[in-house]
């Protein structure tokens, strides 16, 4: 339990964190990786280079300071981060290392006096304990459910399927021949990739793109532009070098962006680009479980060449009367225009959504590039969709949709 004095001191640093938060977290990661380079086997190098991880951590530290007198308020965020930590294999012993480096960064960047550093040291201990406790429960649950396991387990790529010019699916089965644990539609797994010539292991999280209850997991990966770009290194390796029969270490499914199976409301699945992957898991689950809920599947792509899984979605729409699918192409090809195989040219807008979705009393799920997600969030706000009915997932560190 933190003293009133400690809480007061930590809360007094909120303006400082607002002003220098990213500077502090940038310095923190420099210290962390300089003194503990082995942790580069866990953290996503791309998010480091782009500054996304630094921003996400700055946001988390700022929230912790703001709500230090009411940490219950940030438990949902702690759980969301906890899912990623469990998926990556972050353990209790990592927290003291992080705490030491964070306090050093606060001192170096802000010139914080000992009184502030001591207060933050106490506060960090309480926050770390919350993470450790929640993540311990997650490790237990993942390991002890049927077909479950702890940390990483080797999976064989039994099938590799090209879904579009830029997206390929990988079907994964356990190398040990055992069962795979079930998951909730919308969840992801972490895969480990060791690229020849690279010093450190690359971890990447990919949404599971099929319904649970199969003998395999399926991930569907977008090939990012440029082999030498941070984004493209792993995705190009998967597309170009990983083949059927290869083995990849995989973590148990994780994540809190999940389909609410208890709701009876209609379901609206809105995706942009590779954001279609968790939506496919949700769609397939709804039809396989014979749900009678109306489903509106809205997808945005550049054109038919980059539009993955369109034949499957069309087949589902044709077979199940409760499913309606709509496609928006930002730059349709001449063939697309000739075939009229899409519903709207340009971008998804609130006025168009109003014409294809008859009610705002529905569960709305969306995923895609950050700019797309900001646009969709604004559109749903325009339509006065209730906040509790809006669900979304970032591919990478969380950011603001405002």
Curated annotation (Swiss-Prot):
Residues reported in the UniProt entry to bind NADP(+): 273-278
A single GO BP: nitric oxide catabolic process
Reactions this protein catalyses: 2 nitric oxide + NADPH + 2 O2 = 2 nitrate + NADP(+) + H(+); 2 nitric oxide + NADH + 2 O2 = 2 nitrate + NAD(+) + H(+)
EC main group: oxidoreductase
Residues the record marks as active site: 95 (charge relay system), 135 (charge relay system)
Cofactor dependency: heme b; FAD
Site (Involved in heme-bound ligand stabilization and O-O bond activation): 29
EC number(s) reported in the record: 1.14.12.17
Domain named Globin: residues: 1-136
Function, as annotated: Is involved in NO detoxification in an aerobic process, termed nitric oxide dioxygenase (NOD) reaction that utilizes O(2) and NAD(P)H to convert NO to nitrate, which protects the bacterium from various noxious nitrogen compounds. Therefore, plays a central role in the inducible response to nitrosative stress.
Record family assignment: Belongs to the globin family. Two-domain flavohemoproteins subfamily. In the C-terminal section; belongs to the flavoprotein pyridine nucleotide cytochrome reductase family.
Name of the protein this chain belongs to: Flavohemoprotein
């Amino acid at each position: 339990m933190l003293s009133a004095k400690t809480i007061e001191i930590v809360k007094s640093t909120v303006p400082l964190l607002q002003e220098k938060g990213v500077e502090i977290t940038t310095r923190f990661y420099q210290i962390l990786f300089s003194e503990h380079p082995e942790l580069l086997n866990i953290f996503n190098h791309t998010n480091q280079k782009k500054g996304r991880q630094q921003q996400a951590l700055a946001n988390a530290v700022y929230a912790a300071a703001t709500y230090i007198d009411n940490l219950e308020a940030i438990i949902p965020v702690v759980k969301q981060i906890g899912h990623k930590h469990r998926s990556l294999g972050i353990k209790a012993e990592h927290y003291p290392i992080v705490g030491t480096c964070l306090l050093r960064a606060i001192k170096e960047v802000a010139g914080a006096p000992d009184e502030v550093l001591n207060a933050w040291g106490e506060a960090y201990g309480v926050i770390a304990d919350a993470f450790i406790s929640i993540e311990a429960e997650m490790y237990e649950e993942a390991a002890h459910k049927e077909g479950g396991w702890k940390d990483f387990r080797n999976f064989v790529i039994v099938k590799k399927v090209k879904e579009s010019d830029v997206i390929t699916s990988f079907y994964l089965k356990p190398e040990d021949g055992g069962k795979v644990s079930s998951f909730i539609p919308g969840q992801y797994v972490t895969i480990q990739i060791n690229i020849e010539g690279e010093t450190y292991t690359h971890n990447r999280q990919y949404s599971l793109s099929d319904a649970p209850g199969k003998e395999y997991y399926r991930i569907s990966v977008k090939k990012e532009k440029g082999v030498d770009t941070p984004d493209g290194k792993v995705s190009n390796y998967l597309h170009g070098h990983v083949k059927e029969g290869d083995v990849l270490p995989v973590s148990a499914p994780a994540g809190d962006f999940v389909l609410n199976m208890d709701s009876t409301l209609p379901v609206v699945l809105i995706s942009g680009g590779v954001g279609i992957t968790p939506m496919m898991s949700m769609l397939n689950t709804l039809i396989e479980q014979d749900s009678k809920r109306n489903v509106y599947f809205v997808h945005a792509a550049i054109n038919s060449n980059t539009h993955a899984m369109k034949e499957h979605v069309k087949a589902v729409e044709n077979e199940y009367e409760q499913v309606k699918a709509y496609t928006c192409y930002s730059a349709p090809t001449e063939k697309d225009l000739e075939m009229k195989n899409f519903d709207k040219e340009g971008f998804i807008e609130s006025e168009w959504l109003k014409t294809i979705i008859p009610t705002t009393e529905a569960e709305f799920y969306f995923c895609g590039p950050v700019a797309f997600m900001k646009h969709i969030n604004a559109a749903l706000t325009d339509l006065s969709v209730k906040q509790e009915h809006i669900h979304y997932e970032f591919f990478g560190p969380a950011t603001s949709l405002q």
